[in-house]
Amino acid sequence: MTSQHRQPEQVAQHLRHSLGRLARTLRHHDDDDLSPTTASILFAVGREGPLTAGDIARRERLAKPSVTAAVEKLATAGLVERRADDSDGRVVWIAITPAGKRRIDARRARRTAWLTIRLEKLDPADVETLSRAADIVDRLIGEDDQP
């Protein structure tokens, strides 16, 4: 059966499997010791700017206690800092530090380099197909990924 004739459930299973393998492979080839949850939080704060723990929990779909524990690890490592809100002392903002930004940049560079090497071995038409597929995946997850 060709991919043109696969039912949505079959495509969903194949896509889930392939993207999961890609994510695991990228983690395996990365020497970073951050857990997936901690890395996700660091990337969110780096991407979105200062966030509260509640903001992070909603955006990353994590339990607030998990966010609190991960932020503590990131703060201890000097990758994020906590800042009190100027107008409401009860609110604590979590912001990325320069060391956190460097960590994100290095992680992205390593993973991009690994993937680029593999993409360069493919036929240009396959690279274009993967580019279009990535756009489709972005649209697919974007439907549910709104904060």
Predicted ranges, named:
Residues 1-36:
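N-terminal leader segment of winged-helix/HTH proteins
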Residues 3, 10, 22, 26, ...:
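Amphipathic alpha-helical dimerization/coiled-coil segments
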Residues 8-12, 16, 35, 64, ...:
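Short, structured helix-loop boundary elements
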Residues 25-66, 73, 77, 93:
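N-terminal helix-turn-helix DNA-binding core of bacterial DNA-binding proteins
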Residues 29-32, 101-106, 139:
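Helical hydrophobic small-molecule/effector-binding pocket
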Residues 43-47, 108, 135:
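Short, locally clustered residues in the helix-turn-helix/winged-helix DNA-binding domain
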Residues 72-132:
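Charged, amphipathic alpha-helical coiled-coil/dimerization segments
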